[in-house]
C-alpha cells in the first residue's frame, strides 16, 4: 500500500486523501446507524489517510522533492 502511494503525484495524493476521507466518514456513519461488514476497514482507512498526510507534509516542508 505504501509503495502505491509513493508512486502518485502530489495532486493525485491530495485527491486520493479526499476520497479516503469521504469513504471513512461514510463508514463511520454506517457503524453508528447499523451494521458494518468489515469493522477493520475503518482502521485501514485511518492509517492510509495518515500515511498520505505524512507524505504530503514531507513535500510541504521539503523532505521530499517533487
From Swiss-Prot:
Keywords: Ribonucleoprotein, Ribosomal protein. GO terms for cellular component: ribonucleoprotein complex; ribosome. InterPro entries: Ribosomal_uL29, Ribosomal_uL29_sf. GO terms for molecular function: structural constituent of ribosome. GO terms for biological process: translation. The keyword Ribosomal protein applies. The keyword ATP-binding does not apply. Belongs to the universal ribosomal protein uL29 family. This is Large ribosomal subunit protein uL29. It comes from Borrelia hermsii (strain HS1 / DAH). The gene is rpmC.
Amino acid at each position: 500500500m505504501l509503495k502505491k502511494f509513493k508512486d502518485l503525484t502530489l495532486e493525485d495524493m491530495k485527491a486520493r486523501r479526499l476520497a479516503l476521507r469521504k469513504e471513512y466518514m461514510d463508514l463511520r456513519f454506517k457503524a453508528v446507524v447499523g451494521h458494518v461488514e468489515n469493522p477493520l476497514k475503518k482502521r485501514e482507512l485511518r492509517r492510509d489517510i495518515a500515511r498520505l498526510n505524512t507524505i504530503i507534509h514531507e513535500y510541504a516542508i521539503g523532505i521530499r522533492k517533487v
